[in-house]
Swiss-Prot record:
Keywords: ATP-binding, Carbohydrate metabolism, Cytoplasm, Galactose metabolism, Kinase, Magnesium, Metal-binding, Nucleotide-binding, Transferase. GO terms for biological process: galactose metabolic process. It is found in: Cytoplasm. The keyword Transferase applies. This is Galactokinase. InterPro entries: Galactokinase, Galactokinase_bac, Galactokinase_CS, GalKase_N, GHMP_kinase_C_dom, GHMP_kinase_C_sf, GHMP_kinase_N_dom, GHMP_knse_ATP-bd_CS. Its EC number is 2.7.1.6. Its main location: cytoplasm. Belongs to the GHMP kinase family. GalK subfamily. It is an enzyme of class 2 (transferase). Catalyzes the transfer of the gamma-phosphate of ATP to D-galactose to form alpha-D-galactose-1-phosphate (Gal-1-P).
């Protein structure tokens, strides 16, 4: 049996998903492909890594197999019996560009196991199983957006998701005359995982200081009671949530000019208040600002490298792409990687 699960790109709502905030992602047309069959022991094969790993029972190896093993462990924790299987994976999802290849692998595994063994796990439960694999087994304290999008994605739509209640709404993504590109900065600073966890701690500090249970209870007035770093972090989360709401409205009205401006202001906030951008992604966004037909751009993902999402009029980005490549190479000695992004449905059999 074969399945595929998509990556995702988040239009706006960065570093809000673990703060009970709003996000606006869509599933993209790049996938993790996975096949599953019965076996004497657990065998996991990755075409991309060109490696096969065998094990008698599920164990943590601190490598790519943990995403698969973690999902199996999540099923077993819930009382499902997963007998040994051979799982083979391949992917055309770029790693480290902010398209969430790990969540796609987790969701592909969860869906394949549910279908293969006839568990018929509901969609939302699949999301939770996949996320639990990353948080508890792999050990990355991610929010729920990535796994949610890989399961619930719908072609030609973005998902307006409230990460606190998990209520969601499909918002039509009518891009006629416009396009979305992803520019991969081709850098990943070592800080990324340690700083990501530090931002989470800082946000928890904010709640402790304000004696609130959730960021949803935090108001603009509360910012007055904070100072320094904590104030900056809280201000980003509050304003980014507002930007998501405005972006949903703009998408519904087909107002891409407004959406573009919101992307630029999101980047400024991630740079100045949340302090997770880096010289390379700042350079890309600054370069694009004011160029003809470019409506907006911002860093995507955890930060400290990774990708930049670009919203433009159709064809406009292609005209300045070469200049951008040259300028970036001259400045950093690194080649950019480009991905034109289209929307996709969520996980499915193939």
């Amino acid at each position: 049996m074969k399945v595929k699960a998509p990556g995702r790109i988040n239009i706006i709502g960065e570093h809000t998903d673990y703060n009970d905030g709003y996000v606006l992602p869509f599933a993209v047309n790049r996938y993790v492909f996975l096949s599953i069959e019965g076996s004497e022991r657990f065998i996991f094969h990755s075409e991309n890594v060109n490696e096969t790993v065998e094990m008698e029972k599920i164990e943590k190896l601190n490598k790519w197999t943990d995403y698969i093993s973690g999902v199996i462990a999540s099923f077993e924790k819930r009382g499902y019996r997963v007998s040994p299987v051979k799982i083979s994976v391949s992917s055309n999802l770029p790693i480290g560009a902010g398209l969430s290849s790990s969540a796609a692998l987790e969701v592909a595994t969860a869906y394949a196991i549910s279908e293969y063994f006839g568990f018929n796990v509901p969609k939302l439960e699949l999301v939770k199983i996949a996320r639990e694999a990353e948080v508890e087994f792999v050990g990355v304290r991610c929010g729920i957006m990535d796994q949610f999008t890989a399961v619930f994605g719908k072609k030609d739509h973005a998902i307006f998701l409230d990460t606190m209640t998990l209520e969601y709404e499909y918002v039509p993504l009518k891009l006629e005359g416009y396009e979305i590109n992803l520019v991969d900065s081709n850098v990943k600073h070592e800080l990324s995982s340690s700083e990501y966890n530090r931002r989470r701690q800082e946000c928890e500090e904010v709640l402790k200081t304000l004696e609130k249970k959730s960021f949803r209870e935090v108001t603009k007035e509360d910012l007055e009671r904070l100072s320094g770093t904590l104030r900056k972090r809280a201000q980003h989360v509050l304003e980014e949530n507002e930007r998501v709401l405005k972006s949903v409205q703009a998408l519904k009205e087909g107002d891409f000019e407004t959406l573009g401006k919101l992307l630029f202001s999101s980047h400024e906030s991630l740079r100045d208040l949340y302090e997770v951008s880096c010289e390379e992604t700042d350079f890309i966004v600054d370069y694009l600002r004011g160029k003809e037909g470019i409506l907006g751009a911002r860093m995507v993902g955890g930060g400290f490298g990774g990708g930049v999402i670009v919203l433009s009029k159709k064809g406009a980005f292609g005209k300045i792409k070469e200049e951008l490549v040259e300028s970036y190479r001259k400045r950093f000695g690194i080649d950019l990687i480009f991905h034109e992004i289209e929307s996709s449905d969520g996980v499915q059999k193939i």
